[in-house]
């Protein structure tokens, strides 16, 4: 039974004297790895350059940029949503901080943003200290 179980793993044909020898030899064989194929380049020569991928086209039409939210539609079909007047959007949308992140001394000590920033800075410091240590 051991011979039939180990038969698919046999890589080298060795002379076999008995079943014990067959079992003993098959357990110490090294398995081979089959790596993925290297990419094949089109054309001749060693220094061929891979094909450069192109990004999405950028819309430069000013009329369309002023009336539609270009690039917001993530579906293949359909078109971009139209831009509505300001009074149709909620007020909190215009109060969002889109600039650089506030520093720790600019935040109020009792806000959750302050404590979240403290936790982040502690994690950054901890990671920086443990960067050079080996396990």
Swiss-Prot record:
GO terms for MF: structural constituent of ribosome
Keyword entries, A-Z: Mitochondrion, Ribonucleoprotein, Ribosomal protein, Transit peptide
Disulfide bonds: none
Record localization: Mitochondrion
InterPro entries assigned: Ribosomal_mL54 (IPR013870)
Family stated for the protein in its record: Belongs to the mitochondrion-specific ribosomal protein mL54 family.
Name of the protein this chain belongs to: Large ribosomal subunit protein mL54
Gene: mrpl54
């Amino acid at each position: 039974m051991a011979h039939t179980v180990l038969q698919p793993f046999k890589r080298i044909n060795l002379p076999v004297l008995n079943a014990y020898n067959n079992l003993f030899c098959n357990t110490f064989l090294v398995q081979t790895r089959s790596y993925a194929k290297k990419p094949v380049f089109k054309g001749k020569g060693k220094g061929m350059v891979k094909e450069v991928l192109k990004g999405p086209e950028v819309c430069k039409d000013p009329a369309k940029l002023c009336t539609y939210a270009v690039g917001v539609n993530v579906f293949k079909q359909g078109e971009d949503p139209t831009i509505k007047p300001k009074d149709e959007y909620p007020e909190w949308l215009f109060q969002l901080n889109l600039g650089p992140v506030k520093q720790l001394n600019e935040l109020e000590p009792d806000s959750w943003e302050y404590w979240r920033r403290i936790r982040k800075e502690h994690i950054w410091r901890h990671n920086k200290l443990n960067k050079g240590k080996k396990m």
